[in-house]
């Protein structure tokens, strides 16, 4: 859902150029999402909220002409007080899981920062180099790898509706990326 919002924002707010095939690919993804919503009769509120908020973030980052490193530093400094308040609140409720008594958990927590920061930095660098639409296409990789991992490795069953949606989305991604390659 996120790449669709980002591409839409690129067209509307950044005046990015899209030919007929790219627009067709966008419509295919939208149809795929709409198909799943109609089949399951559930609106994915969480997915829509996350996708919309991250698309707005990408749009703002694309519009503001600041180096990625400096912008991430500013964002981190702005969010730091909220993180400290949340941390103190958890400590007050005795929900402090941030103790260093368990080595494995401490290792995971220490690496959570870089594992979040590095992809975010690379994404914002990509926004500076290309349009918001092409930069957002990488976000089809995560649900695809989760889908393949779930079905091929963990043996999860996939109903026909999800399979149809998956095929439509990847046909759209192929069309879109093929158009980018031609440019």
Tell me what each language-model feature is:
Residues 1-4, 68-78, 117-152:
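Helix-helix packing/entry segments at the starts of transmembrane helices
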Residues 31-34, 38-39, 89-108, 151-160:
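Membrane-interface helix termini and inter-helical loops of multi-pass transporters
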Residues 20, 72, 77-109, 117-130, ...:
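Membrane-interface interhelical linkers
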Residues 39-95:
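Transmembrane alpha-helical segments that form core, pore/gating elements
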Residues 140, 144-183:
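C-terminal-most transmembrane helix of multi-pass membrane proteins
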Residues 3-8, 51, 55, 84, ...:
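Hydrophobic/small/kink-forming positions within alpha-helical transmembrane segments
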Residues 12-14, 64, 71, 126, ...:
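Hydrophobic/aromatic residues within transmembrane alpha-helices
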Residues 4-52, 62-66, 166-183:
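Juxtamembrane helix-loop boundary signature in multi-pass membrane transporters
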């Amino acid at each position: 859902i996120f790449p669709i919002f980002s591409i839409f924002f690129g067209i509307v707010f950044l005046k990015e150029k899209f030919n007929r095939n790219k627009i067709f690919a966008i419509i295919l993804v939208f149809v795929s999402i709409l198909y799943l919503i109609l089949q399951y009769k559930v609106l994915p509120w969480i997915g829509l909220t996350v996708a919309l908020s991250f698309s707005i973030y990408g749009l703002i980052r694309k519009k503001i002409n600041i180096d990625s490193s400096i912008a991430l530093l500013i964002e981190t400094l702005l969010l730091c007080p909220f993180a400290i308040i949340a941390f103190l609140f958890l400590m007050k409720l005795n929900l402090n899981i941030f103790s260093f008594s368990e080595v494995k958990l401490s290792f995971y927590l220490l690496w959570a920062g870089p594992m979040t920061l590095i992809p975010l930095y690379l994404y914002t660098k990509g926004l500076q180099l290309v349009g918001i639409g092409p930069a957002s296409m990488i976000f089809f990789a995560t649900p695809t790898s989760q889908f393949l991992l779930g079905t091929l490795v963990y043996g999860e069953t996939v109903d026909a509706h999800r399979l149809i949606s998956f095929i439509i989305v990847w046909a759209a991604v192929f069309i879109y990326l093929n158009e980018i390659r031609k440019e």
